[in-house]
Amino acid sequence: MNNKFYKEEVVMACDWFSDLYTNKRLPSHDCISKWFNEYYVESFPVRNAYVTTFGFPLLTKEVIAEITSAINSLVHVGGGVLTVLELCCGSGYLGSLLKENGMNVICTDNNAWKNDDPVHGHGNFFQKPYTEIEEIDALEAIEKYKDKADVIILSWPEYESELAARVLEKCLEYNISMIYIGEREGGCTGDDEFFDIMEERCNERFISDSYIPFPGIHDNIYLVTKKPELVK
């Protein structure tokens, strides 16, 4: 491959992809599909640019509508608007889009990634927050909002970290549904304990028919709830 030509293609791909999100705010499924058909080879550097600006899930209008629909499908004992607690929200991009869809979202993050190496770590991520973000540890956030939260969103929990398992245990303890965005067991999110708990104690289902992962990535969006026989 001609290296100069490839670099030019990458620049074009990045510019087009950036335009999809800056000019249209949130592109459609068809726009993203068209982009992948045109620039599949250049998608890896573009993913890096997207992740450091917005976050790991590739969001479209349809995906946000599907997440909103899944949240609204949950039984809310008190009536009214459901409250969403987003943990480890990064830039707050997902939460900001759900707010625009009428959701009541509390976005939280401990911001530990800001202390990472900007070259080899996450120190250069998310220079622009998209909504108000409360700086608090994930488990502390659950304890603080357990009586308000109807659903917890956990997106791309760190690989081999026990955090996802601890969060899921808290969700089960307090009967709070979870929306999990990430890869399955053997992928790059969560750890074995997290997936063991999910298999043994939870029901899960896809909530997005339109989600498109970046090439080489195998994430999807799941609604995770306690198995009915375990609900007291």
What does each of the following model-derived ranges do?
Residues 91-103:
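Conserved SAM-binding loop of SAM-dependent methyltransferases across substrates and taxa
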Residues 81-90:
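Conserved class I S-adenosyl-L-methionine
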Residues 104-110:
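Conserved SAM-binding motif I beta-strand of class I
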Residues 1-78, 111-151:
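S-adenosyl-L-methionine
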